[in-house]
Curated annotation (Swiss-Prot):
Species of the source: Hippopotamus amphibius
Protein topology in the membrane: Multi-pass membrane protein
Keyword Iron: yes
Protein name: Cytochrome b
InterPro entries, per database record: Cyt_b/b6_C (IPR005798), Cyt_b/b6_C_sf (IPR036150), Cyt_b/b6_N (IPR005797), Cytb/b6-like_sf (IPR027387), Cytochrome_b (IPR030689), Cytochrome_b_C_euk/bac (IPR048260), Cytochrome_b_N_euk/bac (IPR048259), Di-haem_cyt_TM (IPR016174)
Species classification: Eukaryota, Metazoa, Chordata, Craniata, Vertebrata
Gene: MT-CYB
Length: 379
């Protein structure tokens, strides 16, 4: 008799994706982050659902409703802080997942990579709108500053901003629509993640060497299920430690002050995971130029497959490109630090140098390094 997991129409899909899937025998812990992102997404949807049961998307009561969740709802504070810190863990996993793809040349799976870039953009949009919902000072001013950037678009800019706001400033209409979008987008992300997996399973996983591994495959279960469970345990330990011991470590103190349109905070900045892009935006003195650089800092990922010049897929055997890759990581950490600093000397010039270096590394230095390494192969 055929096993039910191989014959039942629904079980068969799950079986082919998570049980009998042929996987390379040598994929390292850097390949754990896909499953961790899935866990993060489920966790965010569940905690978000329970928060939405008590939250009111209204300018007069939003801040109070979040306070009510933390003070009066049974374990409401745990749910609220798991959701807020869950977003930070989500982005740590996202950036690591993208970094892994860059390092090992996984971007040569074009469809999977492009869906991944769309997933990243959608997740960033969702996180931004979620940050507005508690209606604290940084929520309000963050929303005002970031949405106002669209006014830099020639001709339609101002109309576009007022259309997004639903009025002449960030107000009740903005909060209501942001709540609606923040609620629906995670389900869009889930659908995109399924498509992402679908495309990945068309080609099979990449591996650290970048060499086809068809000759040496092992079943996903039990080898990688047990490996994923270890990753999930470490993820949950990190999240719970953060939530229970330092829930406000990654937040902004200004968000404990209710939103006040008449008082601007001294330093407006987004959540830490957007600081690198915010630093690039601020490093250009022209508004439209800054907005374009901001958009390009993320969209440049879609160009990566076209910038691949090496005959080898992975960076595993390419020391020159490895040095440039880690220089890029250091540069991104520098940009993240600068994004959280005030706009004054010496931070302005550091931000400008780091921004130029970011684009220079991706667009020029890494492709050139690939060509040099090709020459060294013949040497």
């Amino acid at each position: 008799m055929t096993n039910i997991r191989k014959s039942h129409p629904l079980m068969k899909i799950i079986n082919d994706a998570f049980v009998d899937l042929p996987a390379p025998s040598n994929i390292s812990s850097w390949w754990n982050f896909g499953s961790l992102l899935g866990v993060c997404l489920i966790l965010q949807i569940l905690t978000g659902l329970f928060l939405a049961m008590h939250y009111t998307p209204d300018t007069l009561t939003a801040f109070s409703s979040v306070t009510h969740i933390c003070r009066d709802v049974n374990y409401g504070w745990v749910i609220r802080y798991m959701h807020a810190n869950g977003a930070s863990i989500f982005f740590i996993c996202l950036f690591t997942h993208v970094g892994r793809g860059l390092y090992y040349g996984s971007y040569t799976f074009l469809e999977t990579w492009n869906i991944g870039v769309i997933l990243l953009l959608t997740t960033m949009a969702t996180a931004f709108m979620g940050y507005v919902l508690p209606w604290g000072q940084m929520s309000f001013w963050g929303a005002t500053v970031i949405t106002n950037l669209l006014s830099a678009i020639p001709y339609i800019g101002t109309d576009l901003v007022e259309w997004i706001w639903g009025g002449f400033s960030v107000d009740k209409a903005t909060l209501t629509r942001f709540f609606a979008f923040h609620f629906i987008l995670p389900f869009v992300i889930t659908a995109l993640a399924i498509v992402h997996l679908l495309f990945l399973h068309e080609t099979g996983s990449n591996n650290p060497t970048g060499i086809p591994s068809n000759a040496d495959k092992i079943p996903f279960h039990p080898y990688y299920t047990i490996k994923d469970i270890l990753g999930i345990l470490l993820l949950m330990t990190t999240l719970l430690t953060l939530t229970l011991f330092a829930p406000d470590l990654l937040g902004d103190p200004d968000n404990y002050t209710p939103a006040n349109p008449l008082s601007t905070p001294p330093h407006i900045k987004p959540e830490w995971y957007f600081l690198f892009a915010y630093a690039i935006l601020r490093s250009i003195p022209n508004k439209l130029g800054g907005v374009l650089a901001l958009a390009l800092s993320i969209l440049i990922l879609a160009l990566i497959p076209m910038l691949h010049t090496s005959k080898q897929r992975s960076l595993m055997f390419r020391p020159l490109s490895q040095c440039l890759f880690w220089a890029l990581i250091a540069d991104l950490l520098t940009l993240t630090w600068i994004g959280g600093q005030p706009v004054e000397h010496p931070f302005i010039i550091i931000g400008q140098v780091a921004s130029i270096l970011y684009f220079l590394l991706i667009l020029v230095l890494m492709p050139v390094a690939g060509i040099i390494e090709n020459k060294l192969l013949k040497w």
